Each structure stands twice: as C-alpha cells, then as structure tokens.
Amino acid sequence: MTPSLHVAGLRFAYPDGSVALHGVDLTVAAGERVALLGPNGAGKTTLVLHLNGILHGGAGRIEVAGLHVDPADRSRLAEIRRRVGIVFQDPDDQLFMPTVAEDVAFGPANLGIRGDELRQRVDEALTAVGMADHRDQAPHHLSFGQRRRVAVATVLAMRPEILVLDEPSSNLDPASRRELAEILESLPVTVLMVTHDLPYALQLCPRSVILDTGRIVADAPTADLLADPELMRRHRLELPFGLHPVPTAARSSARPG
C-alpha cells in the first residue's frame, strides 16, 4: 500500500546559511498516528512546513500518498495542500470568519465546492469534533478548547490524507485535553503530531520519531523511546513526575502464555 507520507533525503538551509534539516528520511503508513518529538530548535516546524510546500528549495523528495510535492507545479500544490491539513498551535491563526460554520466552509469553498456538498462537509467536520451545536456562533465567543476543535474541523472539511497537529494539547484544561484526545483517536486519517507533551504522545501515538539538530535520531514504539532514560536525557526530553512507560517487550513478556 502506498504510504501516506514518504520523505527521502530532505535537506534544507535558511538564507543565513543555517542548516535546519540534514537528510531526513521518514515514512508514515496510511492510518498511522506518529508523534514527532524533539527539543526546541530541532527542525520539527521546518520539516512540517515542507510537507505541503510552504517551505521548499532544499534537496530531497517528499511524496504525499504517492504525489510528489513540487512547489513549481501550482495545480499539484493545491492538491497537496488539500491532502496535508495543518492545525496550528494557536487556533486563532485559523479562525477569522464571522461564524464557526463559515470558518469550516472556507477551505472547501476555495476548492470550488458549493451547495449541498459544502453543507455536508461542514456538518460532517463539526460533528466529528463535537461542535455541530455551535455552528452559528462567533469563534471568539468559544472557549480556547472549543476553538481548537473548530480549527481541527476546518482541516477535516478538506478531507485530508494527513492531519498534522502542532502542540494540540497546549493551553488545554484536563477535560478539554481528554475530549480532544478522544476526537483524535476516532478520526480515520493519518496523524503526525508535533508535541512536547510526552504523555499525550504515549496516549495517542503508538510510534514516535525524535528529531534533533535536523536529524532523525530515533524511530520506535513510543513507549520504548520514553522508557529509555539515556536517550531522553541526550535529546533534552523529560517525562513528568510519576510517569514510567513500560517498554513493549516488557509488556509482551508479562502476558500469560
């Protein structure tokens, strides 16, 4: 099966000459949920912004569901940006219309979708995130957690191949954090989650990748990475007090035969 995402040999340097990515290779299968971990300045945002062609110009190749990300091909780039939906850390960066429904309809409408199909997409996306009852409200009247769910809906309405989430649990109270996790677990899309919230990564993503100094330094089951204290220390990742993940091998051996 064609993977949702295939990145091969991706290198990128900013105009000042600082190299942000050093030959990154990453493949994400369809339907996988993968956490992208790493300290600040590791290159996580730079990598994410390459996935739909916002950043480009370096070496390497990116494919989304088999489609080459080529910023020079404007028609293809529009399809890539439909397939790769990015939910930014601050939902207010994505919500700017008078009502929730208009915000969710904005992307599909720009694709030329109208009438019943547009209404169906809006209804489906808002239902998926539990916000259908708020469709006629102004986004600024919603709580932060509700606005984040609407931001997810704006991307779901595009029917993406990959949902990219930038720090989805930040600034959420415990109930909103749990509700968002339940929503994300229910979505039938590939998920790439950029996060410093290691318990959230453990809860939602069976697999994690650690990026540091522009290189992928680890790629394994999330529990295995978080249970390796030396790996965590080396890449400035810290678990909250009291969290002790059990490696997958230990869990398997503990099962009754």
Language-model region placement:
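The feature captures the beta-strand-to-loop junction immediately N-terminal to the Walker
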Residues: 37-39
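Helix-to-loop junction immediately C-terminal to a conserved catalytic motif
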Residues: 52
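Conserved ABC ATPase signature
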Residues: 138-142, 146
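H-loop/switch region of ABC-family ATPase nucleotide-binding domains
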Residues: 195-196
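Conserved beta-strand-loop-alpha-helix hinge in the C-terminal portion
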Residues: 215-238
